[in-house]
Amino acid sequence: MECRFFISIILFVVLLNPSLIINMVLGYVLGSLFRSNYSRLKKLLSGNKNENREEEDEHISQMKNPFEDAESDVLQHLKTLGLETKVEGDDLEYLQRLWESMSSKK
């Protein structure tokens, strides 16, 4: 009796919503594929991150100073306002660490 009851409930669910069964089967298949190939997938994704980081480092090193072409009176005015564009020492290290942490969170 219980077996017939469970089979009738399963049959009712399949007739009512067959896409649920299809989604469950596809989820099981994809989950088993990911589980069996997880290490390869992890290596593939981490390899892409390292390549992207190298490309970003090259791009950062190629960036030019935006105030390089500014005239001397503009630079003097920026200096009087305290907006000099040179960053050195501890400030430079702090900004580099900040940039690395922001770029790694993407």
Swiss-Prot record:
GO cellular component: membrane
Membrane protein topology class: Single-pass membrane protein
Keyword terms, alphabetized: Membrane, Transmembrane, Transmembrane helix
Predominant cellular place of this UniProt entry's protein: membrane
Protein localization: Membrane
Regions crossing the membrane: 5-25
Sequence similarity: Belongs to the nanovirus U4 protein family.
Name by which UniProt lists this protein: Protein U4
Lineage per the UniProt record: Viruses, Monodnaviria, Shotokuvirae, Cressdnaviricota, Arfiviricetes
